[in-house]
Amino acid sequence: MKENCKIDKKQHITDAEWEVMRVVWANSEVTSKFVAKVLCEKMNWKQATIKTLLNRLLEKNILKKREIGNKYIYSTDFTEKEVANNYILGTFDKICKTKVGEMIGKVIENSELSFDDLDLILKAVEKKKKTAVKEVLCDCVAGQCNCEHSGHKHI
């Protein structure tokens, strides 16, 4: 996989496509038959479903394929970390900026984390403190937010 490949932040991967991508990331290169072997029983999917999902991921340029004999080999240039980061940041882009800190806190509270994970989080918090602002301002469109910080007139 190439480092620092850029995925379009607006590129949405469905939950089903995510399952397929996890198989690709775990194995670098896969055939549709291999993906089906891994997922058909777990997800109760048919081979046709797998092929549809692979084609969607190809259309989104998340996957690429090459032909060897009569088989297609699927792979990706994107790491799981890059796609997960894109997904999470995309989710935070959909909520009021004033609520992001609270949501990050909820994620931490509700996640199983190791001491090493917590050390990484604490280091990130210490680094972020150097550039933190006194107050995060709402940047929502008027009528989309009910935070007290928005300054928007509510009807």
Segments from the language model and where they lie:
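Glycine-centered, phosphate/nucleic-acid-interacting loop/turn motifs that mediate DNA/RNA or nucleotide
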Residues: 61
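Conserved segment of winged-helix/HTH DNA-binding domains
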Residues: 79-105
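Short acidic, hydrophobic short linear motifs in intrinsically disordered regions
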Residues: 30-38
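Short, cationic-aromatic polyanion-contact patches
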Residues: 11-16, 68-87
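C-terminal regulatory/oligomerization modules of transcriptional regulators
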Residues: 109-155
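Short helix-coil junctions and helix-kink-helix linkers
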Residues: 37-45
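Short, hydrophobic-biased segments on the C-terminal half of alpha helices
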Residues: 51-55
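Short capping segments at the starts of secondary-structure elements
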Residues: 13, 25-31
